[in-house]
Amino acid sequence: MAHKKAGGSSRNGRDSAGKRLGVKAFGGEHVIPGNIIARQRGTQWHPGLNVGMGTDHTLFAKVEGRVEFRAKANGRTYVSVLPIAMQAAE
């Protein structure tokens, strides 16, 4: 009798692709307007000076300058872009 037992179905074997989140421009890096600084879910980093936030919480530069991450006493980390003119004055 040439019978073959039915194979069981596996309940594993699924995974979602990585979403490529995280910091794209680190502290001290030069950015131009529109450059993405960080992609995130929720506000892991908050927008500071010259930084905008998209509908998906993406942080982006509004002006040309240097990226700066700063932790405040309230426990939040703010990301700012210091304009080039401001850096020359320092």
Curated annotation (Swiss-Prot):
What Pfam families would the database entry show?
Ribosomal_L27 (PF01016)
Q: Which InterPro entries match?
A: Ribosomal_bL27 (IPR001684), Ribosomal_bL27_CS (IPR018261)
Q: Give the residue ranges for region: Disordered.
A: 1-20
Q: Name one GO cellular component term.
A: cytosolic large ribosomal subunit
Molecular function (GO) terms for this protein are: structural constituent of ribosome
Signal peptide (UniProt feature, chain positions): none
What are the protein's UniProt keywords? Ribonucleoprotein, Ribosomal protein
Task: Give the matching Gene3D superfamilies.
Answer: 2.40.50.100
Name a biological process GO annotation: translation
Xref: PROSITE patterns:
RIBOSOMAL_L27
Family, per the entry? Belongs to the bacterial ribosomal protein bL27 family.
User: What is this protein's name?
Assistant: Large ribosomal subunit protein bL27
